[in-house]
């Protein structure tokens, strides 16, 4: 069987992690099939039996050309006649094949959010939420299967696209096991209670919820609120509206801006903290939640489906309704006296083996 894999835009962040996990799965479960992997320049291309790599340029408008006509032209030039096309980049392509499998991991396309049209993020959200689903529909057919990471994404995608649920498989991604013995203790400011929120400065990450929450905490227990420190993986100025609110309400001492933090240091900070705060309203998975739970760190998060699914079985999570700032403040104050919990371990799941079965045999196998 000839299988083509599309990964030309999987060169950074979470998409690159997924691609690397796929390569490991390919080495173990690729079988005797003929694999053609299409990648961007500079991406990992380890030597694996029966695997050939092809470098393609698909940035910007070239991506659309590739999806609709470019890929079809390339495989014709190379004399490749695919039986299966597996896409790691959320959409399919136009070509002849017996089966198409799409790995979908873009929550913005299926989640409603009230966006401030003046924000830097507005164009990104409007593109992914309104245009992207239309684009996806143009590149799926009755031979298409879709792989997702959580049931939340499965249900949302099925509803958004009108796509049959029985052709969507759920494959929880592999998460790196943390060696706690290698994590050094992080020294926070003495006589303070330190919380951490590792997130990028996108509007839907709802950092400002934490500013409102700390302000509410002062109304409930001002002496304890003075000792609260919220550590952010942002630089001052990345979220001007929040910066202004913090300044106007005299909360400067409560917020610590660290900028980008190396992952190992971040894990040390999470382990040594009094709790992980996670007010984000749009997530495909929410990896920091899993990392905090695996360290036994208390978690305060929005009462949303993705949080319940990811942290199902963890005793150390407290849920708060979205935008209930008074309750957020109360939970943060309560967490100041909380101890750590028993570390949470995910149940074993042979997700990549199951996904490879979908690619090679067209079978959706539940865990």
Predicted regions mapped to residue ranges:
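Conserved donor-binding/catalytic core segment of Leloir-type glycosyltransferases
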Residues: 4, 187-205, 211-214
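Nucleotide-activated donor-binding/catalytic signature segment of Leloir-type glycosyltransferases, i.e.
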Residues: 242-264
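Membrane-proximal helix-turn-helix segments that form the acceptor-binding/catalytic region
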Residues: 124-146
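Aromatic "clamp/platform" in nucleotide-sugar-dependent glycosyltransferases that forms part
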Residues: 281
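Conserved acidic donor-binding segment of nucleotide-sugar-dependent glycosyltransferases
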Residues: 317-326, 334-337
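Donor nucleotide-sugar binding/catalytic pocket of nucleotide-sugar-dependent glycosyltransferases
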Residues: 141-181
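Short hydrophobic beta-strand element within catalytic cores of glycosyltransferases
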Residues: 292, 298-301
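Glycosyltransferase donor-sugar binding loop
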Residues: 37-42, 227-243, 259
